[in-house]
Amino acid sequence: MSTTVRPDEVSAILRKHLAGFESEADVYDVGTVLQVGDGIARIYGLSKVAAGELLEFPDNVMGMALNLEEDNVGAVMFGKSTAVKEGDTVKRTGILASIPVGEAMLGRVINPLGEPIDGKGPIETSIRLPLERKAPGVIFRKSVNQPLQTGLKAIDAMIPIGRGQRELIIGDRQTGKTAVAIDTIINQKGKDVFCIYVAIGQKGSTIAQVVSTLEKYGAMEYTTVIASSASDPAPMQFIAPYAGAAIGEFFRDTGRHALVIYDDLSKQAVAYRQLSLLLRRPPGREAYPGDVFYLHSRLLERAAKITDDLETAKKMNDLPEPLKPMVKAGGSLTALPVIETQAGDVSAYIPTNVISITDGQIFLEPNLFNAGQRPAINVGISVSRVGGSAQIKAMKKITGTLRLDLAQFRELEAFSKFGSDLDKATKAQLDRGARLVEILKQDQYVPMAVEKQVAIIFAGTQGVLDQLDLQYIRRFEEEFLSLLEHKHSDILNSIAETGQMDVDVAKRLKEVAEQFMSTFKQKVTA
């Protein structure tokens, strides 16, 4: 018996089947690898790719488009380029390089892409900010007016740093540049300053040592470490500082204070030179590309003190969408870039560039370091162009003549080596200078509260220590500060709370110092 199928039944069955059919297709813009080597890939296609856009290579290797040429795209790879070969397909991601930010990043060690490398599990944060971002415009900034205490007497007294400033730490290798930076981080404990330490092109063992030091002194609670070691590809070392700036900007734009340390930008410039030469960009002075100044200026301009007016702050240029509801006024981002010089040559290309971008420099000298002066700061050529307006009044008052006294001491010291017959005034000046130099010496990882710095420097500039042997200065300092802390804490509290030292406080402090000196001299000479 034959069955007849009615046409309306057929159409109903077809309609039923077609109802569940999805015609959507995933569309990718893809290209083909023409050439690969040394962490660089030349790609055919990707005609609509943006400069700085992330690309996806096979085996989950990420890359970034840097050269947009007529017939190909030059890209750098963040992973192992050995996994990529000629003819491989490359996908556009449609997103620019970004990094996760937020409080969850504190206490963690990450790579420049924001991936944790400390074995403490994934980072729980939903906010991502772009690595590259325009610096705040002039209208959104405020002049530096709050101090950022480093805890180092030589810096806080003569080369003061303010919140929102860019202060360069420059010197030869092994002169204590990283030590100054780490001491500054340790000194921010309890001061509501979030710190970001960016290690660029350093040995893995050195980075591990820095992390363990920060943990030992309880500084990792408010610090993020971005590690791009010497074994990482050059593109990772190139983007590391921008990752640090992005994390710092989150705190800056949400009304808080952040400190970012780039250790060091010389190695970032070398990594960028390597990339540029491999991408066949024309070389300039010292084989660096023509835009190496812009490499550092666009990074360091992101450090700023933001205006206190909330309505103005909310209109800040280039504000990413995730940040807009969280914006608060009055935040700051302070940058301490580090530059390594070769044989003290500050007139080389990268050092002169960064000196001209920053608001001052702390110059560390091997001769001073080897002579036992730590930190080995050359006060003569170190300067802070804007920090003076942020320095507390008490410190400004007592250090007015300190820089001049030390400069004259250095000059007289050089001349005194030629002859032994010195007049009384010259000898007194030499003695005072030697004691001031001794006062400014400080052990590593022992930052000092600003009120204690004021007390001991005041004792030195008032001539209280002039008759004391140099070998006893450090001991006097320890015992004198201990006495103030336990028996005259009101003096220290007054300086700490008001930031000033009025006539009465100065008079009392001098009396206490002189009384203690007389008993101390009896004790050491007995």
UniProtKB/Swiss-Prot annotation:
KW Cytoplasm (keyword) present: no
Main location class: membrane
GO MF, any single term: proton-transporting ATP synthase activity, rotational mechanism
EC number annotated for this UniProt entry: 7.1.2.2
Site entry: Required for activity: 382
Membrane-spanning parts: none
Catalytic activity, as annotated: ATP + H2O + 4 H(+)(in) = ADP + phosphate + 5 H(+)(out)
A UniProt-annotated Pfam family: ATP-synt_ab_N
Subcellular compartments: Cell inner membrane
Bilayer topology term: Peripheral membrane protein
GO cellular component: plasma membrane; proton-transporting ATP synthase complex
This protein's UniProt keywords: ATP synthesis, ATP-binding, Cell inner membrane, Cell membrane, CF(1), Hydrogen ion transport, Ion transport, Membrane, Nucleotide-binding, Translocase, Transport
Enzyme kind, highest EC tier: translocase
The UniProt record lists the keyword Transmembrane: no
Positions that bind ATP: 171-178
Free-text function comment from the UniProt entry: Produces ATP from ADP in the presence of a proton gradient across the membrane. The alpha chain is a regulatory subunit.
Subunit note: F-type ATPases have 2 components, CF(1) - the catalytic core - and CF(0) - the membrane proton channel. CF(1) has five subunits: alpha(3), beta(3), gamma(1), delta(1), epsilon(1). CF(0) has four main subunits: a, b, b' and c.
Family named by the database record: Belongs to the ATPase alpha/beta chains family.
Protein's name according to its UniProt entry: ATP synthase subunit alpha
Organism whose genome encodes this protein: Chlorobium phaeobacteroides (strain BS1)
